[in-house]
Amino acid sequence: MIQIRKNVFETNSSSTHCMVIGTASDFEKWEAGEVYYYDNWRDGKKFITKEEAIDKLKNSKYRTSDTDKAIKYLETYELDASDYDDDEDEAKRAIFEEMANNYVYEYDYYVNDYYEYLESEEATYNTPGGETIKVLCHYGYDG
């Protein structure tokens, strides 16, 4: 690797890297659907409740009818698949895509669909202070 700037890690610009780090309990809640992962550089990365996710969607600068469908789904967990030839999986995917457009991620969608063309890795670590943390990484070329 050629060093271009000192004290800066340079990577191939066509590669993608992302990482979610949280406590084991945060990940358990995310996997169970009790919280959502919120990834916005302005507000910081964090896990948020369903109510906070609804609030983020309601206050979106780019709110559309699809955003309203996502809000309705989060509020009621009722799914209207009529726009998707009654295919509930396709309807859910569209809702989760709209949530992702607003930086709100449901666990299964984030892990299995959002970065579907990237390599994934998940690991658990114990900190020196005794806390258990989990790390979820996606990396590779997405092009």
Where are these regions (language model features)?
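Charged, amphipathic alpha-helical linkers/stalks
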Residues: 29-49
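Intrinsically disordered, low-complexity, compositionally biased regions/tails
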Residues: 17, 26, 37, 48, ...
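Intrinsically disordered, low-complexity peptide-like regions
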Residues: 10, 15, 37, 78-81
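Low-complexity intrinsically disordered segments
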Residues: 46-140
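Intrinsically disordered, low-complexity regions
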Residues: 13, 23, 34, 45, ...
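Short, extreme N-terminal segment that most often corresponds to the first beta-strand
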Residues: 1-26, 137-142
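Intrinsically disordered, low-complexity segments enriched in small/polar residues
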Residues: 20, 31, 42, 127-128, ...
